[in-house]
């Protein structure tokens, strides 16, 4: 498979501000400390200090959230590494969406992992990816649907409160509808 890089501006999906920031436009330089490149990340890493109490709280919270889940060896290794004062994190996240949301959500996850691995090699220090899901800060109507092409698939209901605690009543019908739109063949599994 041939890889063809597409520059951010060519996608037409990012504002001029984002494109200017990523290209290093001098007029924006006063608004951030470190450039969004490997040298900027290296400089930022050298300045970061994580309070021991905050680090312990993060590890304890992650272990609690993973309770009852069989963890992949890499996750176990990263949790143990997070306890060390020298370990850094690449932290990103996303607002919860039906079916994970746009494709850039898994892309964000994979890039956080890749960046953590790259920085571990470049810095000579362990860097662990941390991804948070914003499940508590928005209303159901913001996340109860997905667009599959021009077809809107919607999860019916009106439950209130934190989205992360809502019952999954009716979700099977939504999944079935998505399968009907996408198809159930081998290509749909990709």
Cite the ranges covered by each PLM segment.
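N-terminal targeting/trafficking signals and adjacent low-complexity tails
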Residues: 1-190
């Amino acid at each position: 498979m041939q890889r063809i890089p597409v520059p951010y501006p060519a996608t037409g999906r990012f504002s001029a501000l984002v494109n200017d920031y990523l290209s290093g436009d001098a007029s924006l330089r006063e608004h951030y400390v470190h450039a969004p490149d490997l040298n900027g990340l290296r400089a930022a890493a050298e300045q970061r200090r994580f309070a021991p109490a905050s680090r312990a709280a993060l590890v304890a919270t992650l272990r609690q959230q993973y309770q009852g889940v069989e963890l992949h060896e890499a996750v176990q290794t990263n949790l143990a590494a997070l306890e060390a004062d020298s370990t850094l994190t690449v932290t990103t996240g996303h607002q919860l969406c039906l079916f994970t949301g746009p494709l850039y959500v898994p892309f964000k996850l994979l890039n956080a992992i890749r960046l953590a691995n790259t920085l571990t090699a470049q810095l000579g220090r362990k860097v662990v990816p941390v991804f948070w899901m914003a499940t508590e800060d928005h209303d159901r109507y913001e996340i109860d649907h997905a667009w599959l092409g021009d077809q809107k698939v919607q999860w019916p209901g009106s439950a209130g409160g934190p989205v992360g605690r809502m019952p999954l009543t009716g979700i099977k019908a939504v999944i079935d509808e998505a399968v009907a739109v996408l198809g159930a063949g081998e290509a749909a599994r990709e």
